[in-house]
A protein has these predicted regions:
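Bacterial Sec-exported substrate-binding components of ABC uptake systems
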Residues: 2-8, 16-68, 169-199, 249, ...
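Short helix-initiation/N-cap motifs at beta->coil->alpha
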Residues: 47-50, 99-109, 234-242
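A short, structured surface patch at a secondary-structure boundary
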Residues: 61-114, 118-125
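Short secondary-structure boundary segments
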Residues: 66, 123-124, 234-237, 256-260, ...
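Alpha-helical, coiled-coil/dimerization segments enriched in small aliphatic residues
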Residues: 86-91, 210-237
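Proline-aspartate-enriched helix->loop->beta-strand connector
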Residues: 108-121, 141, 242-255
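Extracytoplasmic ligand-binding site segments that recognize negatively charged/polar headgroups
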Residues: 126-131, 147-161, 196-217, 260-263
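Structured C-terminal subdomain patch of bacterial secreted/periplasmic proteins
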Residues: 154, 160-164, 173, 177, ...
Length: 317
């Protein structure tokens, strides 16, 4: 039985250092899309890694290799069409009942047995997943690599792209419009913030503390809630030691991970952190990792979680 290195942990690591690739909204006139029948199928599209993918009909057996893709599929009403998901898929609840294809390693034999007519892979882990999926590609199974969304707009475009290849383009447009409306409502609550809080986003704990600078989705979250990034002078995802965090003295520290027990207390107990404003003001906050790190339909909820973490008084008004 062959097992191939899968997508999830690597997706997070690659996300830390990869360059952004802008997705292009699909249109009938786009050179990247060729539509046939009125239903939109057969359909030929170009995916995030430049591969031309032909889909003969609206898929009814979809394998999703990463949780964000799965959340999008369910939000588009494709509950029954999803036949396989990763070991880490836990939302919505129905996703947890689907056949598991593996976690850090995916099982190509399990995927094959599901007889998928569409596989949704992810750009951030494609370099390691490609070889394992090659037998399925050779057998004629369409494999669409989804863009590694690094912004709100790219997330919307990803949803629209998945909607297109699954025959749910209208549903995708409706979903995106609803998300945009929710985002606008949250932004409106914080539009008049005068005393902006400085925030340190901590995506992993000791001994390797990672944070997010410019050009990341986390930076856009902070921009949209009228907060300052404590590492706005840095680019992308980077590792930072405790001493540097203390010197930057953030007003709020947001923990976007759940794998360390009593993480908030652990941060407060670090040497020198008793001098940090966030610790003195009891503003070290842990948020739901799944919600804030998956670029998908829960993006507005992620924005709300971060807004409540940074400006609890304003968000509770």
């Amino acid at each position: 039985m062959k097992k191939w290195l899968g997508s999830l942990l690597i997706a997070l690591l690659v996300l830390a250092g990869c360059n952004e690739q802008e997705a292009t909204p699909s249109e009938e006139s786009s050179p990247e899309t060729e539509q046939g029948t009125e239903s939109g199928f057969p359909l030929t599209v170009t995916d995030a890694v430049g591969n031309e993918v032909t889909i003969e009909k609206a898929p009814d057996a979809i394998v999703s290799m990463i949780p964000s893709n799965t959340e999008i599929l369910f939000a588009l009403g494709l509950d029954e069409e999803v036949v396989g998901v990763s070991d880490y898929d836990n939302y919505p609840e129905a996703a947890a009942t689907k056949e598991k294809i593996g976690g850090f390693e995916f099982n190509v034999e399990t995927i094959t047995a599901l007889q998928p007519d569409l596989i949704l892979a992810h750009e951030s882990a494609w370099s390691t997943a490609e070889a394992g999926l090659q037998p399925l590609k050779d057998a004629g199974v369409p494999i669409f690599v989804v863009d590694n969304a690094m912004s709100f707009d790219e997330t919307y475009e990803t949803i629209e792209a998945i909607g297109e290849v699954t025959g749910k383009a209208e549903e995708a447009e409706t979903l995106v419009a609803d998300m945009q409306k929710q985002v606008e409502e949250i932004e409106a609550k914080l539009a008049e913030v005068e005393d902006k809080k400085t925030v340190f986003i901590e995506s992993s704990g000791d001994p390797e503390i990672y944070t997010a600078g410019q050009g990341t989705l986390m930076q856009e979250f902070l921009d949209r809630i009228n907060a300052e990034n404590a590492v706005a002078d840095q680019e992308g995802w980077l590792m930072m030691n405790s001493e540097e965090i203390v010197s930057r003295n953030p007003d709020v520290i947001v923990l976007t991970y759940n794998y360390i027990e009593n993480a908030v207390d652990a941060v407060k107990a670090r040497p020198g952190f008793d001098q940090v404003t966030a610790v003195q003001q009891d503003a070290v906050v842990q948020v739901n990792e799944d919600i804030v790190t998956r670029p998908g339909p829960r993006l507005p909820l992620a924005l709300e979680e971060l807004a409540k973490a940074v400006y609890p008084d304003l968000m509770n008004d």
